[in-house]
Amino acid sequence: MDCHTKETLGVTQWRRSTMLTLSLLYAITPADGAKEALEYKTWTNHCGLAATLRKVAGGVLTKLKSHISYRKKLEEMETKLRIYALKGDGVGEQKSAEILATTAALMRQKALTPEEANLKTALKAAGFAGEGAAAVSSYLMTLGTLTTSGSAHCLSNEGGDGDGKDQLAPKGCRHGTEADFDAGAGPAESEVADSGFAQVPGKQDGANAGQANMCALFTHQATPHSSQGIYITGAQTKPSFGYGMLTIGTTDQTIGLKLSDIKGKQADSAQKFWSSCHAAVKAAQDMKADPALKVDQTLLAVLVASPEMAEILKLEAAASQQKGPEEVTIDLATEKNNYFGTNNNKLEPLWTKIKGQNIVDLAATKGSTKELGTVTDTAELQKLLSYYYTVNKEEQKKTAEKITKLETELADQKGKSPESECNKISEEPKCNEDKICSWHKEVKAGEKHCKFNSTKAKEKGVSVTQTQTAGGTEATTDKCKGKLEDTCKKESNCKWENNACKDSSILVTKKFALTVVSAAFVALLF
């Protein structure tokens, strides 16, 4: 390529660059004709929409946090109830605490189902709102930069006699900030109506015209590459801003999109984004926040009144009767009164005991304790629950070992009784030869032929002890039997009972044995 050719190309490129610069300058240079700046109310309404959309993320965050708080409070109460049920002293209160804890667990689990849907709703709303706010702010902030020292501008002020760009940020057209994503109240009902975004009614033609001879941006130009203005002819060449928020219809004539009735217009490509944006934002606005809960007797009352409590009480009844839930009916009011008192009058005393329950302080030195009500961290509560579950399990293991030992001792005692000794003899002659045994030819199925004979033992002068069915003992040399009431009462070893004189030592032994057995079974309960 020779020098002349290079010089020619350089000049050509300079001319193109110069023409592009001039065309941008022409767009904001006053000239003959209308060339109006954008009317104040039009563009500030659009900025107001951006401000509304900036609130969406904070609003949905507040609702999501309410869902998390709701479940955490239920978990805190549930865990405290279970710890108390493991550690508390009252059997009846332990049962009530378990029922309340199970109800809280069911409520917490049910809350997860709508929460999953709410997460998607929140994400869509924040995404559409953020994009919409950026689309509006971007186009208007760009128009705000098209100004020259007071002689030209594209955004009219409120009075229609000057540049309004200084009102962009105050009216809502700004860059996004971290504060936009802090929890907040969200848009008001008046801002996001069921039919659309109420603050953008849409305006056309002259209604959007501001101060004249200030902005040639919206002016038609058949040769925009060499003259100020843009090419506006036909459906394919109608420039728009902000995803269709503002469209240039003909020279110096703009159309503001009507958003107050944008609902359900996704099928229209020109309105699809804003209709979808409204649908997403409205869904988030309709999303319900969970009520704030306080972990005290008021939450216990919420549990009692919940539909989940009715489910749990019915399951309790079905389990106790070994039937299916559909096979049983309960008197709900009666069941609630039994567990929680008339008008829930047992709840406050129960909560007082729960929060005042002494528990081990896992973070302190050995032997340190604190009250259960002082613990609010659910992770620490779960550790405490695991601790007391293990303690309770070990105590039950020791109790079971004691019961087994008692049962073995009782079995050994029964195995050494005269009756059992006689039962071991299988031959009639040997049985009858024994001083305390007799052979019975006719016996019931399963019974032994050789049995203990207390009369024979008495006659032979043998003093033996016979184990009773209840585990007690009866002396065969009963000196009280057959005595009259007056004589019986005078004897130190006799007692008048059920119109007969009985050996008091037998009664004492029986009662002692029954007491041991009863104690063993009571121990099983704990």
UniProtKB/Swiss-Prot annotation:
Disulfide bonds: C47-C173, C154-C215
Record key words, sorted: Cell membrane, Disulfide bond, Glycoprotein, GPI-anchor, Lipoprotein, Membrane, Signal, Trypanosomiasis
The protein's role, per its UniProt record: VSG forms a coat on the surface of the parasite. The trypanosome evades the immune response of the host by expressing a series of antigenically distinct VSGs from an estimated 1000 VSG genes.
Any one Pfam family match given in the protein's UniProt record, by short name: Trypan_glycop_C
GO biological process: symbiont-mediated evasion of host immune response
Subcellular location: Cell membrane
Cleavable signal peptide: 1-33
Membrane topology category: Lipid-anchor; GPI-anchor
Keyword flag Cell membrane: yes
One term under GO cellular component: side of membrane
Region (Disordered): 157-193
Lineage: Eukaryota, Discoba, Euglenozoa, Kinetoplastea, Metakinetoplastina
UniProt-recorded name of the protein: Variant surface glycoprotein MITAT 1.4A
Covalently lipidated residues, kind GPI-anchor amidated aspartate: D503
Proregion positions: 504-526
Chief localization: membrane
Annotated glycosylation sites: N453
